[in-house]
Design a protein with these regions (language model features):
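Glycine- (often His-adjacent) and acidic-residue-rich active-site loop
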Residues: 47, 55-100, 119
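Conserved CoA-thioester-binding segment of acyl-CoA-metabolizing enzymes
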Residues: 1-56, 72
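Glycine-rich beta-to-alpha active-site loop
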Residues: 96-141
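Hydrophobic/aromatic residues within transmembrane alpha-helices
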Residues: 16, 53, 65, 126-128
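A short, glycine- and basic residue-enriched loop/turn
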Residues: 21-24, 58, 67, 138-140
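Conserved phosphate-binding and hydrolysis motifs of nucleotide-dependent enzymes
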Residues: 19, 25, 63, 117, ...
Length: 141
């Protein structure tokens, strides 16, 4: 599991947190992969009854990390650290950003998104994927 997303499981609750507080949890290629891996890791867990997705720090997710755009553009292969490659999901071609949202829809357990601070762009997309959203009144969406 990546340091970009942490998972703590206790009493049947998977506490899944985006973990780039210094960047307001903005996503880049590594973060997209880490989100997908986190969701995938919960699929076959019989000890998890619910997942709560949130962000460490003062924001859920401020969207794309613009500083990673140039690295994504210049990467020519999927193995580049910051690339967000097109991949297969249930037989369809999808972008890693779509997979980061879709993975929460695939879980057979309820997924709750706890939002505060910002949920912009890619962060908004990831906030809309879970089954339930709990939103702080000052959240910017």
């Amino acid at each position: 599991m990546s340091d970009y997303v942490t998972i703590n499981i206790e009493d049947g609750v998977a506490d899944v947190r985006l973990n780039r507080p210094e960047k307001l949890n903005a996503v880049d290629g590594k973060m997209f992969r880490a989100i997908v891996e986190a969701g995938e890791s919960l699929k076959d867990r019989s000890d998890v009854r619910v997942a709560v997705l949130s962000g460490n720090g003062r924001s859920f997710c401020a969207g794309l990390d613009f500083s990673s755009f140039q690295a994504m553009e210049s990467s020519s292969g999927e193995n580049s650290e910051n690339s967000a490659p097109i991949d297969l999901l249930e037989g369809r071609m999808t972008h890693m950003g779509q997979q980061a949202a879709w993975v929460w829809q695939e879980l057979e357990i309820p997924v709750i998104c706890a939002l505060e601070g910002h949920a912009l762009g890619a962060g908004f997309q990831n906030a809309m994927a879970p089954d339930i959203r709990i939103v702080h009144p000052d959240t910017n969406m």
